[in-house]
Amino acid sequence: MANSPQARKRARQAENRRQHNAAMRSMVRTYLKKVNAAIASGDQGSAQEAYNQAVSVLDKATRKGKFHPNKAARHKSRLNTKIKAMAA
């Protein structure tokens, strides 16, 4: 266990950050699931709207360092490809 005041503070900060990061990751996953559900339903309009919301949340999480930029780009690319395939 942390003995010095500095170590106790660092442990407190680490726990707060862990909880905040987990909440942000969970929110991103939820938005990605909404896009996939909209794609599965076959409604391109709702899929595009859900995609736009997901991109916003994903980009915000990436700016804050919760996700690697390449991972965010990969998610966006794959979802966009699925939405474009719906139109064809």
From Swiss-Prot:
GO terms, biological process: translation
Keyword Iron-sulfur: no
Pfam family, one: Ribosomal_S20p
InterPro entries: Ribosomal_bS20, Ribosomal_bS20_sf
Bias type Basic residues, positions: 69-81
Entry keywords, A to Z: Ribonucleoprotein, Ribosomal protein, RNA-binding, rRNA-binding
Region (Disordered): 1-23, 69-88
UniProt-recorded Gene Ontology molecular function terms: small ribosomal subunit rRNA binding; structural constituent of ribosome
GO cellular component: cytosol; small ribosomal subunit
Function per UniProt: Binds directly to 16S ribosomal RNA.
Family, similarity comment: Belongs to the bacterial ribosomal protein bS20 family.
PANTHER family: 30S RIBOSOMAL PROTEIN S20 (PTHR33398), SMALL RIBOSOMAL SUBUNIT PROTEIN BS20C (PTHR33398:SF1)
UniProt-listed HAMAP family: Ribosomal_bS20
Protein name per the record: Small ribosomal subunit protein bS20
Annotated gene: rpsT
